[in-house]
Amino acid sequence: MADYKSTLNLPYTQFPMRGNLPIIEIKILERWNRDNLYEIIRRKKNEKKLFLLHDGPPYANGFIHLGHAVNKILKDIIIKFKGLSGYDAPYIPGWDCHGLPIELQVEKLIKKVNMDIDINSQEFRNYCREYVKKQIEIQKKDFIRLGILGEWKNPYLTMDYKTEANIIRTLGKIISNGYFYKGIKPVYWCFQCHSALANSEVEYNDYHYSNAVDVGFSIVENVSINKIFNINCYIENIELVIWTTTIWTLPANQAISIHPDYIYQLVKILDNEKYLIIAANLVNMFMNRIKCTMWQVLGEVLGSKLDRLTARHPFMNFNVPLVLSKHIKLDSGTGLVHIAPDHGPDDYLISKKYKFKNRDSLIDSNGYYLSNSHNRLCGLHIFNANEIIIDLLYKSKNFLYFNANYQHSYPYCWRHKIPLIFRTTSQWFVNMDHNNLRDKLLRTLQQVRWIPDSGYSSMQSMIVNRPDWCLSRQRVWGIPIPVFVHKKTEVLHPNTCIFIEQVAQLVEKYGIQIWWDLKNEDIILNKAESMNYQKIYDTLDVWFDSGSTHDSVILDRFNSKLKSKLQIDLYLEGVDQYRGWFMSSLIIAVAIKGYAPYKQVLSHGFTIDDKGNKMSKSLGNIIRPLDIVNKFGSDILRLWVASSDYSKDMVISDDVLKNVTDIYRRIRNTIRFFLANINDFDPEKDLVQSNRMVALDQWAINHTLSVQVKIISNYEQYKFHNVIRYIMKFCSIEMGSFYLDVVKDRLYTLNKDSLARRSCQTALYHIIESMVRWIAPILSFTADEIWKYIPGNRSKYVFTEEWYDRLFKIDENQIVNSNYWNFFLNIRNKVNKVIEQERVNGIIKGSLEADVILYVTPILKKKLRILKNELAFGLIVSSVMVLSIDDVDFNTIKENHEENSDELKVVLKKSHGIKCLRCWNYTLSMSKNENYLNICSRCVHNITGLGEDRRFF
């Protein structure tokens, strides 16, 4: 039997079926690095419109985690698609270099090397700087392995001398505009940080347990209280009941606050003759708490009537006043709040309103009670004091009414995961209400595009409720707050802004250590004057470091390409950065420039496992990005990021990665089919003009164009999961289940140089030129690999290109236009249902074994006959007859048929033809030529002559 394989145009390509990504990606990275790909792109795009995505700097500490990978990959996708869209989109990665976490790691390393080493602050800063350098190199290597293109040779570091100097200059602008002040306020305090924290460094633990207690304070003016409640008989020992979850603050109590507009009741507990004052709305809740069933209401008054009365502290030897405050709520407690000005912002404001005398703090910076607290508490840590305080309450005439564990949300240190306290200390702040800053921030929010929209409301609520920003930290490794204050008045030196610039110039040359080395007279040249001032040694909140980079880094790097009003196009970070980098950047920008630093803010969710748990060491569910890369390749990780809806938490697991691998395989195999079938195609010689192309090929290019429009639109909207969805649908349905199936006969069996075959190759060429660009931002390594297999002259890298612009629309004036193709595809789907049913029934094994009769209305018959004898190729069957639906009685038809509709009925029967060994069609028109036995006449014509002519399929 003759072998006709050599007469076929069988697909061939050296593009591998298997990606082998973990190995091939390393080689590609070596080439990118050798060629300096990032610089090639910059030179090519230099004259284009600038698009700036500013990198929120990750902390230079530890290996990268999955959250880092998600963030960097999303940024890289955007940078690359913006390049394809005709922008100059540079990417300057950055690192946050100062702060406590670095200090802690360096301390551990020093102790590990030499337990007895004693180093000074300067040496410690040097250790920190060297540690950060090493950490950056580790993280940089991992980010590059993910396929992230950027200015890795010159990233921005908040510890670069010039950046440190510029951050100090930004602080100078804050000071110059009047927002900077020193205040004694309660601030979040971490005992392990030994420092104040800003709101952005606080996270809330919803599963924190505290001792909740109801405590009685005896009224001193019993006569007055009897009159206020209009009690006829004289009552003694009336108590005000407060409820608190911070027992340790009771020794610091200085007042009890009540709401002026709430009703308060004097109630008598009948079984023990106790007289208590509680908010009327909370009496029942209180009685349930103490399991009291019998009480009597003796009277009620507005809270305002109780103002300025006094009560006796239950175990400290002093009286405290009743004061009015509208911050009290009626959702829990008793409607009376104990006021400890040292340990709460609202308490502090009340103390200022009522001009309380300043008292020395009762606790030190480590959380231990001082001698001025209580003799039983001195030297005890506040978190270990509950039992003693409860005992003091029991022994003080039974002033404790209720004591129980209470679960509630409580502030924790973002780094140490331990409870925080409010502690009144002297700190430096940004005044949120100076020059209407808070109102300006709220107005500015409306001018920013928030993605998702919920970002706007998140920022709005935080700004409304935000206290003044505490800028100062009591740390060693940080950018100094380089100011001088008068030793007596603590007022800033009048030349502070001049000094700031002088210090910045020195820091730019010598680094931050210079501030600690300087003497007063080095800056304040008048020696006598310098004696009256002291240098401040506090360091800046690290959120000021990173939050000022729009001014200290971007303005410096892109000044030549920027207009007078600098607004960065996009900030992109995790949802936790609304209270962090997004917020600090906004406050600084509005304070110094009057407008937002960014035009758009995009946030992404966290990574979670398939059970909905966040990644954590304790759960043992952490997946390192480099483990995924080493097993599957970076493109699989990138595809997972792109295919996930990052606006929510992103699920990752072995099953999820398996599904992503299947998606990748489908895309790769589709492109491999394209490459394999244009291996003998030279676009310089073989490209067919659109008006000469086969109709189906025109449809394919038209459809590719419509898909490309959707893909680009979804890239622009940052909806990358939709991009993947469109690509997958294109590969699996429009191409895989239709176009590529139909054109196989034409590609394989027609004359190699026939117009019909070259037409199809032209379509495949245009489509792959489009597809390689579609996937390049996401599957960067694979796109780079594909690029070198596409025929024709081209630039070295797809990343220097723009979206493919040689696709075209169908001429809608021609008969076989878009509407006609929709009509045909509807017919084809109905025929395929019948074919599949008969295959399941065992009548046929494949569609080419089928002869199909279409019974249709005259209108449909006329439309189908446009395709003439090519209809069978479009349906991938051996033969098709189109008959009138009115000319047949279906009861007389023995073959199975599908009652599709009143317009169309499909009848299928197994072909009685002979199978052609070359094209596999079944036909009665077999060759009688002795040189070409067992093949059909059509195949002989295609082998020996010019071949058949195709207009439609």
Curated annotation (Swiss-Prot):
* InterPro entries (UniProt xref): aa-tRNA-synth_I_CS, aa-tRNA-synth_Ia, Anticodon_Ile_BEm, Ile-tRNA-ligase, Ile-tRNA-ligase_type1, Ile-tRNA_ligase, M/V/L/I-tRNA-synth_anticd-bd, Rossmann-like_a/b/a_fold
Which positions are annotated as binding Zn(2+)?
916, 919, 936, 939
Q: Where in the cell is it found?
A: Cytoplasm
Q: Which residues form a coiled coil?
A: none
State if Protein biosynthesis is listed as a keyword: yes
Required co-factor(s) are: Zn(2+)
Tell me which residues bind L-isoleucyl-5'-AMP: 573
Q: Does the keyword Oxidoreductase apply?
A: no
What's the Enzyme Commission number for this chain?
Answer: 6.1.1.5
Domain of life, per UniProt, equals Bacteria
Reaction catalysed by this chain?
tRNA(Ile) + L-isoleucine + ATP = L-isoleucyl-tRNA(Ile) + AMP + diphosphate
**A cellular-component GO term for this protein:** cytosol
- Locus of motif 'KMSKS' region: 614-618
Cofactor binding mode and count: Binds 1 zinc ion per subunit.
For this chain, one GO molecular function annotation is: ATP binding
Q: Name one GO biological process term.
A: isoleucyl-tRNA aminoacylation
What CDD domains has UniProt attached to this entry? Answer: Anticodon_Ia_Ile_BEm, IleRS_core
Listed A to Z, the keywords are:
Aminoacyl-tRNA synthetase, ATP-binding, Cytoplasm, Ligase, Metal-binding, Nucleotide-binding, Protein biosynthesis, Zinc
Give the residue ranges of motif 'HIGH' region: 58-68
Q: Spell out the subunit comment.
A: Monomer.
Indicate the family of this protein.
Answer: Belongs to the class-I aminoacyl-tRNA synthetase family. IleS type 1 subfamily.
Q: Which NCBIfam families does the UniProt record give?
A: ileS
Query: What is this protein for, i.e. what is its function?
Result: Catalyzes the attachment of isoleucine to tRNA(Ile). As IleRS can inadvertently accommodate and process structurally similar amino acids such as valine, to avoid such errors it has two additional distinct tRNA(Ile)-dependent editing activities. One activity is designated as 'pretransfer' editing and involves the hydrolysis of activated Val-AMP. The other activity is designated 'posttransfer' editing and involves deacylation of mischarged Val-tRNA(Ile).
Which named protein is this?
Answer: Isoleucine--tRNA ligase
Gene label: ileS
